[in-house]
Amino acid sequence: MSNRKYFGTDGIRGRVGNAPITPDFVLKLGWAAGKVLARHGSRKIIIGKDTRISGYMLESALEAGLAAAGLSASFTGPMPTPAVAYLTRTFRAEAGIVISASHNPFYDNGIKFFSIDGTKLPDDVEEAIEAEMEKEITCVDSAELGKASRIVDAAGRYIEFCKGTFPNELSLNGLKVVVDCANGATYHIAPNVLRELGATVIAIGCEPNGVNINEEVGATDVRALQARVLAEKADLGIALDGDGDRVIMVDHEGNKVDGDQIMYIIAREGLRQGQLRGGAVGTLMSNMGLELALKQLGIPFARAKVGDRYVLEKLQEKGWRIGAENSGHVILLDKTTTGDGIVAGLQVLAAMVRNHMSLHDLCSGMKMFPQILVNVRYTAGSGDPLENEAVKAVTADVEATLGNRGRVLLRKSGTEPLIRVMVEGEDEAQVTAFAHRIADAVKAV
């Protein structure tokens, strides 16, 4: 990955108006991608976006670049990231492109590619696109230029796909659900999916205006959802992020239910139904309570590096079907190819209905350990804090004290000069003190 100039672990992302998220760069990216993808045969590309105002500008730039390379673009309009992956597969398109910065504020945006089978583009294709970016743009002959069209029934197709992942013999009749769409790409999808399955739906975060995506709503800020669930005396709340690939839930008492708990519920239900193949994949940040709860059920558990890309890689390596991050990325490979907030939420609802249990009760088999995270800023030129002997000594001392009833994790942020210090254990006061003790050692470097 180190030789990449533009592609990160999750496509290309940045502040709108600053390189690389500028109209001229994105036009050239469209052209370069078009040149590479045209070698593979199909000349159709699916393009979706979330609700950011900059999406209009960037999809026009992509369209021009692709057309110059001789590829035609089919636009979905605002559409969740997993929906674009699904539509890319069903239309047999050469690739899908999503214009989104997921859970980031509106002033950021990004470009992410899906391959013909709805998974991330292979590394060699990304590298070939980067190589084309170094060349001058050339236009194909006029008769060969690409066209643009709109997929008018994209939302309806995806709504039916989501409903198809919910067991036919079950219904959501009698359930009152608050759904928070983060003023993002699921605003016209998620409420309809839930209503058509029989739920009484109260929708919030469903009034996008181009600049309010993820603003005090959605999976990264569930306070509005918690308040509304309690006010409406709802059975539960579902929060999606701006592009619909994350889900966080709220039980009828207003308690947050994160990605670890959601995976626990889905894995346990899969085991009960005899449908669980292998184990479950979490990340280095997954709560120790998840690991212990799965162990009690006899379900194998493996940790991947933080990032849904790495969860997917670990699933493929082990041949397992279910993985998640505590942030709410839940990957269910027996249902779809990528993290899908709506689909994951539906599997939890199915477990509630089938077992006649509340979300609160479904979570009760898993005891969450207190997990304290402290971010410490460091100066890039002052040496690597993770290699510092004093930091190592304090960390080893804390680990020895915790034994097998806790964990310590130190890692660098992928985007900022931060060291993330995470300490987990049974006693919140103790782990808080330990986390700050290690953080102080990092600061002293």
UniProtKB/Swiss-Prot annotation:
Keywords assigned by UniProt? Isomerase, Magnesium, Metal-binding, Phosphoprotein
Which residues are annotated as active site? 102
Q: Name one GO biological process term.
A: carbohydrate metabolic process
Q: Which family does it belong to?
A: Belongs to the phosphohexose mutase family.
Give the modified residues of type Phosphoserine: 102
Query: By its UniProt entry, which NCBIfam families does this protein fall under?
Result: glmM, PRK10887.1
**What is its EC class?**
isomerase
User: According to its record, what are the GO cellular component terms?
Assistant: cytosol
Provide the catalytic activity annotation: alpha-D-glucosamine 1-phosphate = D-glucosamine 6-phosphate
Q: What does the cofactor section's free text say about binding? A: Binds 1 Mg(2+) ion per subunit.
Q: One GO molecular-function annotation for this sequence?
A: phosphomannomutase activity
> PROSITE patterns of this UniProt entry?
PGM_PMM
What is the annotated role of this protein in its UniProt record?
Catalyzes the conversion of glucosamine-6-phosphate to glucosamine-1-phosphate.
The name this protein carries in UniProt is: Phosphoglucosamine mutase
Superkingdom in the source lineage: Bacteria
The record's listing under InterPro entries reads: A-D-PHexomutase_a/b/a-I, A-D-PHexomutase_a/b/a-I/II/III, A-D-PHexomutase_a/b/a-II, A-D-PHexomutase_a/b/a-III, A-D-PHexomutase_C, A-D-PHexomutase_C_sf, A-D-PHexomutase_CS, Alpha-D-phosphohexomutase_SF
Pfam families recorded: PGM_PMM_I, PGM_PMM_II, PGM_PMM_III, PGM_PMM_IV
**Sites where the protein binds Mg(2+):** 102, 241, 243, 245
Q: Does the keyword Magnesium apply?
A: yes
Return the EC number.
Answer: 5.4.2.10
